[in-house]
Regions:
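C-terminal cap of thioredoxin/glutaredoxin-like
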Residues: 2-51, 106, 177-265
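Short leucine-rich amphipathic alpha-helices used at interfaces
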Residues: 21, 54-55, 167-168
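Ser/Thr/Pro/Gly-rich low-complexity linker/stalk segments immediately outside membranes or between
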Residues: 54-67
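A short beta-strand-turn-helix
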Residues: 68-85, 113
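Residue-level signal for pocket-adjacent positions within structured domains
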Residues: 71-73, 159, 223
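Residue-level detector of conserved, well-ordered beta-strand and adjacent loop positions
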Residues: 79, 88, 229
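Structural alpha/beta surface segment adjacent to cysteine/selenocysteine redox centers
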Residues: 83, 88-181, 213, 251-262
Length: 265
């Protein structure tokens, strides 16, 4: 999700100009008090916005989906099944940092890591209770997967997170239904699946898998059996993938890495 334009310098522009106006208005007491009131209102509004706006860091976990008897996890694969490096992403569709990774970083990851065969990425649901509409979003994406369209729906959900999240609406389904049409789904079949909450156990199993792996915030990534928390940059992820690929690609001779021949002069 693109960052909000809430830089202190932007918020302070009207405040500073109002102060200058007030200082020059000593001969106009009515104007002075009007401007003073405006300053107070601007300050209150700015503080309120800072207090309620989504934070950019990882979102702490609170268990949501039912993980009882959930069975084995089943994520959503992108890339080759036999890719040398496996990236497991545990994310929440309503998590701002997850949207940031999807919109800002993941396009490069896909074209320069996944599409080139260096690694695969598998998405696992990790819904959080403080996000009111996230289970519904996971359900919408799972039903899109039934028609082979998980990733287009995944992308659309993150791109449009601002309009369907729990702070924006109590009824996300109309938005999801529109996205289903936009990504080319049979909307009637998708809606039947969505209304039945057909994949709730799958979502719960994915959450349970993350908990077993020690995931406690979103987004989190498991790469080479190591857990990384927070929104990763492309460069950081590429370095990890390259390191794992290098450590596993050396040929073995009698169980030991083969000697690397040196150039002769």
């Amino acid at each position: 999700m693109p960052p909000r334009n809430d830089r202190p310098s932007d918020r302070n522009v009207p405040r500073k100009s109002a102060v200058r106006e007030a200082r020059n208005a000593s001969s106009r007491p009515k104007a002075f008090y009007w401007l003073l009131g405006a300053i107070v209102l601007v300050g209150v509004a700015a503080l309120s916005y800072v207090a309620i706006r989504p934070k950019g860091g990882p979102t702490d976990v609170i268990q949501t989906a039912d993980t009882t008897n959930a069975g084995p996890s089943q994520g959503y694969l992108m890339g080759k099944v036999d890719a040398p490096v496996k990236i497991l992403e545990f994310a929440d569709f309503e998590c701002p940092s997850c949207a940031g990774f999807s919109v800002v970083t993941e396009p490069d990851v896909r074209t320069r890591i996944i599409d080139t065969g260096l690694a695969s990425i598998t998405y696992f649901d990790f819904p959080l209770t403080q996000h009111r509409n996230t289970l519904a979003a996971s359900n919408a994406a799972a039903c899109a997967d039934e028609q082979g369209k998980f990733w287009p729906m995944h992308d659309r959900l993150f791109q449009a997170q601002d309009e369907w999240n729990g702070e924006a609406t109590d009824s996300p389904k109309p938005f999801f239904k529109r996205y289903a049409q936009e990504v080319g789904l049979d909307v009637a079949k998708w809606e039947s699946c969505y209304d039945a909450r057909k994949y709730q156990k799958r979502i719960g199993a994915n959450l349970a898998d993350g908990l077993r792996r020690g995931v406690n915030s979103t987004p989190s990534f498991v790469i080479g059996n190591k857990l990384y928390r927070g929104m990763a940059s492309y460069d950081a992820m590429k370095a990890i993938v390259d390191s794992i690929a290098k450590s596993t690609s050396s040929p073995l001779v009698n169980g030991a890495p083969a000697a690397v021949p040196t150039k002769t002069k």
